[in-house]
Regions:
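Extended, well-ordered alpha-helical scaffold segments
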Residues: 28-42, 85-104, 152, 156-184, ...
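Extended glycan-interaction surfaces of carbohydrate-active proteins
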Residues: 1-11, 35-57, 61, 68, ...
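Active-site cavity-forming subdomains of large catalytic enzyme subunits
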Residues: 66, 70-76, 80-114
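Short acidic alpha-helix initiation/capping motifs at coil-to-helix transition points
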Residues: 11-15, 155, 173-174, 207-209
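Well-ordered alpha-helical scaffold segments within catalytic/enzyme domains
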Residues: 9, 17-30, 70-87, 151-168, ...
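Short coil/turn segments at secondary-structure boundaries
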Residues: 24, 58-66, 86
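Generic short alpha-helical segment signal, independent of protein family or function
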Residues: 24-28, 38-45, 54, 76-80, ...
Length: 257
């Protein structure tokens, strides 16, 4: 397993899947990577891997929309390093189950909308990496269609297409409509970037780094001139010598240190 922050934090699904390629694949620890995939796959429930494993004897928690999608991305990287499609074949039924649950609906309002995009969220529950919560107050709730979640969803579908082709099954997993809906609805022409969130009340124009996932995942959703504009926007508003801000200083909600 991987610990999110020894000794304060235990196993977190999101952190594990994001860190796994760097910790296990680049370093040649492929057996350990395989064991981690198996451990999380064994705890898939209603199409979701755990957000975290609490202390011994306690049930896993599932309040995350992105950890399960990062599982696909990490597995794809594993296959690029190992070519171990026999292992992917073992996970294939679980992967198909995950996609089915996301299409029909699972916990916390996570489901595919009529446009093919993934929507998620309910009051009082934090589901994305922006998961700060003070008492009952979710600081950044992001209920609706977050930009990075839909980039991850698109990548999960493209990875399913790749695996289906390898396994001689129907490779049409519905990725193309997601790409079309994403580019139509997330593009913010006013700033030359992507909306951070789509909601029934309208899009959220907050300039955040989440939009970068539409460019940086294995299967990019945005390319060419739009991609260049996004990078320029992020560089102008978010880049610092210490990394990326999570919100543009021009935003009314921005709080400096």
């Amino acid at each position: 397993t991987l610990l999110a922050g020894y000794h304060w934090f235990t196993d977190w699904g999101r952190d594990t899947m994001i860190a796994l390629p760097g910790i296990c694949l680049v370093t040649g620890r492929h057996t350990e990577a395989k064991s981690i995939f198996q451990a999380f796959a064994a705890h898939v429930s209603a199409g979701m891997i755990p957000n975290r494993f609490p202390d011994v004897g306690e049930e896993p928690e599932y309040n995350t929309v992105d950890a399960t999608l990062w599982f696909f991305s990490a597995l794809y990287k594993y296959l690029q390093y190992t070519g171990d499609y026999d292992f992917a074949k073992e996970l294939w039924p679980t992967l198909k189950e995950i996609v089915t649950w996301h299409r029909t609906g699972t916990r916390y309002g996570i489901r595919v909308d009529a446009d093919g995009l993934l929507t998620a969220g309910e009051e009082g529950v934090q589901l994305t990496w922006m998961d700060a919560k003070v008492g009952d107050w979710v600081v950044t709730p992001r209920i609706g269609k977050p930009v990075e979640i839909n980039a991850l969803w698109y990548n999960a579908l493209k990875i399913m297409e790749h695996l289906a082709t390898e396994f001689g099954e129907d490779a049409d997993c519905g990725a193309d409509p997601v790409r079309a809906a994403f580019n139509e609805q997330f593009w913010n022409a006013d700033c030359g970037g992507l909306f951070d969130l789509l909601t029934p009340c309208g899009p959220d124009p907050a300039i955040r780094p989440n939009q970068l996932f539409a460019l940086s995942l294995p299967f990019a959703l945005v390319e060419g001139e739009r991609a260049a504009q996004i990078l320029a926007l992020v560089e102008e508003h978010l880049l610092t010598p210490r990394g990326l801000r999570s919100l543009s200083p021009t935003d009314p909600a921005y709080r400096a240190r």
